[in-house]
Amino acid sequence: MDPPGSDVGGSIADPLTAGSLFACRVLRDGMDTAPTRCTWPGATDALYLAYHDEEWGVPEYDSRALWEKLVLDGFQAGLAWITILRKREAFRAAFDDFDPEKVALYGEADRARLMADAGIVRSNAKIDAAIGGAKIFLEMRDNGEDFADFLWAFVDGKPVQNVWPGTGQVPVTSPEAEAMSKALKKRGFKFVGPVIVYAFMQATGMVNDHLEGCFRHGPVRAMAR
């Protein structure tokens, strides 16, 4: 989520390249029948458009899926989210489909394997953060804590429904993201600065930041439990 030159903890980021944190603007892609959508996916990249139309902002309640997204957002620090999106399947293959039981057991041979894998973002610090995060995830589970419940508690279990008319109103963080970031860091998670965390919250539907003019705003709002 963070642009080049930001701090390694991911607390500073450009909102237009910050993971799934996107300052949405309404865009019509040039076709009369095209839906009105946020501008950040552009109008030509099918992968990006599908991510916006099908995934971004949809409430996610599965603990393992949430952990995967948090790990990927950490790997995105310093890069554009589309880079990670294009490598997502390679990441899943490299990290045993983000099975925390397996990732938590990774040793030096696995670290070397991952650092040699050109299909993913190769960073010792980020790889170590993923392995460490898997261990924390399992510790929480073994102590009777559900990861999804832990995260959703920061928004009282319900998505924050924003109604932004334009890009300038969309924030890069929030009090809830600040609190979640602080709690994740206290647990030992890495690459979880408040800007990264807010992007994570947007992407996983804890916050609905599709602009009110985007065709996905209403459907995403209706998905809230």
Would you name each region that the model predicts?
Residues 21-225:
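HhH-family (HhH-GPD) DNA N-glycosylase catalytic core used in base-excision repair
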